[in-house]
């Protein structure tokens, strides 16, 4: 499949022009929204993206440690380790991180959605949320496969325990409901405890 050059992708990002006392200043739309303490987590959760999200969280904490940060999520999930880097930073920093699902929050995306500040986790009305157990695939010697299988079981148990804490669901319910892909509407995600509310409009 043909990949668009980075220069073409960059050209598709809208620019915002602001008037200041020193004249005009232009920002790409994401940088402008970062000034409003808005971060976008869009697409596959992977190491490079996680590093950018972590850097933005730390920057906004240094700017105003007492103001909320808004993390908008539209993601099919991805790497557990990359996702946990974002999650741990969300819990570590002083500002509350409010999470909002736009489109979809699946797998690690759903975990990060649930990991937002209590009372400040939201879905938009037509978004979808999906939880499941972590995926794993490994080839090699039998003893190495056994080691990796044990590791993924440990990760599964850890994620289930943390999801139980964030949702208020018993661990047995989480284990059952993450055994296979489990899709939820925005209202179902709120009822389950993955988010606190469904937002139709601001205010």
Swiss-Prot record:
It catalyses: Hydrolysis of proteins to small peptides in the presence of ATP and magnesium. alpha-casein is the usual test substrate. In the absence of ATP, only oligopeptides shorter than five residues are hydrolyzed (such as succinyl-Leu-Tyr-|-NHMec, and Leu-Tyr-Leu-|-Tyr-Trp, in which cleavage of the -Tyr-|-Leu- and -Tyr-|-Trp bonds also occurs). Pfam families: CLP_protease (PF00574). Keywords: Cytoplasm, Hydrolase, Protease, Serine protease. GO terms for molecular function: ATP-dependent peptidase activity; ATPase binding; serine-type endopeptidase activity. Disulfide bonds: none annotated. GO terms for biological process: protein quality control for misfolded or incompletely synthesized proteins. InterPro entries: ClpP (IPR001907), ClpP/crotonase-like_dom_sf (IPR029045), ClpP/TepA (IPR023562), ClpP_His_AS (IPR033135), ClpP_Ser_AS (IPR018215). It is found in: Cytoplasm. Its EC number is 3.4.21.92. It is an enzyme of class 3 (hydrolase). One of its GO terms (cellular component) is cytoplasm. The active site is at residues 107, 132. Its main location: cytoplasm. Belongs to the peptidase S14 family. Fourteen ClpP subunits assemble into 2 heptameric rings which stack back to back to give a disk-like structure with a central cavity, resembling the structure of eukaryotic proteasomes. Cleaves peptides in various proteins in a process that requires ATP hydrolysis. Has a chymotrypsin-like activity. Plays a major role in the degradation of misfolded proteins. This is ATP-dependent Clp protease proteolytic subunit.
